[in-house]
């Protein structure tokens, strides 16, 4: 049973509130809290000059600012603290604040606690954004007013009073957002799980436990959708309190969703043919199977089929940038883990020239070499992990005699220029880094846009 948002409005009036992080989602949050009558102090590592007009706007509204390297030193004496998702709950500043009696929360926790409308939460190591987007397209296609948020879309907490009982809310939720989530989510989807973000999580188990929070607080009416072919997500079944539905690209699941002989089935009814789906690759077949199960009570098979045959995909996900002299260039910048890169490579019908490497999340690259080599024609490595990735491919050669030609470069532009010189007519070049972007770019979107800019300049 969702709580009445009027309770929050009454609670927050006059409260001394700290908001950690002045990012995309927290700017509307801060403005909303001010409008609700809270006394807000915003904290950020950036300085006044870096914040620019944002700081000026907050100053005019009476928001206090704590900025710079030691910005958390004054996170004291607050009634409520909204933390940024990437801030660990066991950080020194938050531990101290909780001991002082502060209520520590996040925008997403409060949104899920109070929002009206059916909530669909999607998480996983790979496929979150595409599955989230497919689910939103299915619901919109059925005629529902649909709100998309979390890791994608727009910040929703400030829109909460515009969301109605009959609306649908679709949230992409990261492990960071889920670490402190204790709210019930009506429909929970976990696409798959593999090692990821181990630079932020203390262990793989902590990462898995964070993901479990998407379903662990459900009641008997909740629905959990998981991947039958992923050992970790399949294991979630024994802990689920509600209904569980599984999807598979490898076996028939009469009570779930499955792929067989070129056809996608939902509870043993044909939905569409694989070859008619616009976005290619078996990973996208799995994304559709998950989305079909998540929306089976709200969306007709006819709408599902139509969306599959018309939805053209999400930017930075195996996105065709252009074809030059018979060479196709794809932007798969979202591929920030080896498993995601493998999924992208398997979508092509031939060996490809791969540009990889980037920020080190402390996850193993062995799968990229030992499972990925059949799909790689040439490998161009860049970024902080290039030597680490090369070592794994060198081990592959030493152990199995399988050699992939590897080129080492210093920049993305050098990588693209080299790929252009190597490629022959009919070849495919893909940016599929298997790593995060933070060593070279602020996020995967900026990395992908830079790749597209370089390719378009060739």
Swiss-Prot record:
ATP binds at residues 124-130. The keyword NADP does not apply. Its EC number is 6.3.2.9. Keywords: ATP-binding, Cell cycle, Cell division, Cell shape, Cell wall biogenesis/degradation, Cytoplasm, Ligase, Nucleotide-binding, Peptidoglycan synthesis. InterPro entries: Mur-like_cat_sf, Mur_ligase_C, Mur_ligase_C_dom_sf, Mur_ligase_cen, MurD. Pfam families: Mur_ligase_C, Mur_ligase_M. One of its GO terms (biological process) is peptidoglycan biosynthetic process. GO terms for cellular component: cytoplasm. It is an enzyme of class 6 (ligase). It is found in: Cytoplasm. Pathway: Cell wall biogenesis; peptidoglycan biosynthesis. Belongs to the MurCDEF family. This is UDP-N-acetylmuramoylalanine--D-glutamate ligase. The gene is murD.
